[in-house]
Amino acid sequence: MLDVKSFQLQSFLPLPYEEVLAPRLKRAHEKLQSGSGAGGEFTGWVHLPRDYDREEFARIQAAASRIRANSQALVVIGIGGSYLGARGVIDCLCSPNYNLKRKDTPNIYFVGNGLSSDAMGEVLDLVADVDFSVNVISKSGTTAEPAVAFRFFREALEKKYGREGARERIYATTDKARGALKSLADSEGWETFVVPDDVGGRYSVLTAVGLLPIAVAGVDISALMQGAAEMMEACTEASFQCPAWRYAAIRYELYRAGRSIELLACYDPAFRFMAEWWKQLYGESEGKEGKGLFPASVEFTADLHSMGQYIQEGKRLMFETVVRLGPSDRQLTVPADEADGDGLNFLAGKSLDFIRDRAMEGTLLAHTEGGVPNLIVETSGRTPADLGQLIYFFEYACGLSGYLLDVNPFDQPGVEAYKKNMFALLGKPGYEDRRAQLESKLEG
């Protein structure tokens, strides 16, 4: 089972902070469990690992099997919570080099998360001469980046297979009853999957939003959900026995002590997009009303050679949360070299994992001694069940953290500001007055 460990935090935290925070955490816990807190209408994810729709889950598995059988590539169109979780899980469980590996599952390309002609054009080129399918993910169907991307890939599908053939290769994950994408999918006869009304995008990786692409990659999504269910059960414990309580409490107390940045560190490159998912989860949930930790991430040991100097001796703004994944199935040992010109024969016969763990321990000690608090989130393995536990753990701790800050962890009103400006500057009907104001500001 996943565990949270503090690392020599005594000098950084008031003791006993657990006793002081316990009543507030209990209230936050009760709000999550009952859906009675701010944004409670979006807490469907809390019991999702137990209550998910089994019929739709079976349809997800069937669709994934069809895609694996008839496609050499799957194009996943989505932005933010509509793609980060799936990409994170696939990278973590399959490989960040997934598309380069020899395998019996399709390549998976993620688009619609930006507005780059080069990036979009490259993926269009990559799928031009192979059989491919598309999974477009959008609650409304009107979010600019994925909606624009879908136009390109729908056109490519219809040119390649005809409108009828394309119909069998488009899968829409969207609202169950309304919205532009739902209306279009129903009129065209595409298979649809549901973005639940009571689950926000950044909490949706364990719904069809994440599960369909993850299943196409060959990951056992039943085991993923089982792991999440195990952590859900652990999080029903209204005490510091719950790992999410410990994590939420430590980060809140460090925030109160003046730490404004949380640096998520992992020693495995496969975790990079899980860290990107985590950044959105915590950034959108906490960052409002002038409050919240700024979530950032680093990949060690690589970033010890770029950011390590600042972490060690720069301004004392941050603390580190180190994610330690369980043992790897693959073990490489350092070969001996008779000449020993690099002086590294003292490492001969030792595994890379052993060396990495000593690097981690040395870094924990150095950064702590340099005034940077550290805590460790540790999984017992690297299986789908382990990652399911980790996903639910971060989600539950995030909900607790938002309520500790007295903010709504389930809305994101600030995201609309750039959208309104962008639409006005692009000439969207109804934004004429705003466009004139913005153009005047840009000229000034």
What are the residue ranges of the model-derived segments?
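Flexible loop/turn segments at secondary-structure boundaries
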Residues: 82-85, 117-119, 142-145, 178-182, ...
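Extended, charge-enriched "interface" segments that sit outside catalytic cores
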Residues: 1-68, 336-346, 434-444
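Active-site phosphate/pyrophosphate-binding segments
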Residues: 159-321, 326, 414-444
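C-terminal helical/tail subdomains of lipid-metabolizing enzymes
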Residues: 377, 381-444
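Helicase-primase coupling helices
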Residues: 296-382
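Glycine-rich phosphate/diphosphate-binding loops that line cofactor/substrate pockets in enzymes
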Residues: 59-72, 123-131, 251-260, 311-316
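Short, solvent-exposed amphipathic alpha-helical segments in soluble enzyme
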Residues: 91-94, 125-127, 151-153, 186-188, ...
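Glycine-rich phosphate-binding loops that contact phosphosugars or nucleotide phosphates
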Residues: 65-238, 424
